[in-house]
Amino acid sequence: MNVTDVKIRRVVAEGRMKALASITLDHEFVVHDLRVIEGNSGLFVAMPSKRTQEGIFRDVAHPINALMRKKVEDSVLEAYAIREENGEASELELAALEATDPS
């Protein structure tokens, strides 16, 4: 499975969250609301989550192995970096990221 499209929406609020992202997998399945977060060790990608009635945040969607997590994170962070370099106000679309697939 490959990340075939990434859309970045910059967040204009103060705080650690820098952007929201949507990814398309194999041109067939979209996952919205991934978050680009500034952590203590740099940027990372948080999966979309929902608060339970108990107040605990639970991922709505997430990769089930390290390879897919790396593909998602690398694709989103690359799109975010390009978006920041270009300083564009509109959404950035990165298509055909299949070239980053090691297989």
UniProtKB/Swiss-Prot annotation:
One of its GO terms (biological process) is sporulation resulting in formation of a cellular spore. Keywords: Cell cycle, Cell division, Septation. It comes from the Bacteria. InterPro entries: SpoVG, SpoVG_sf. Could be involved in septation. Belongs to the SpoVG family. This is Putative septation protein SpoVG. It comes from Exiguobacterium sibiricum (strain DSM 17290 / CCUG 55495 / CIP 109462 / JCM 13490 / 255-15).
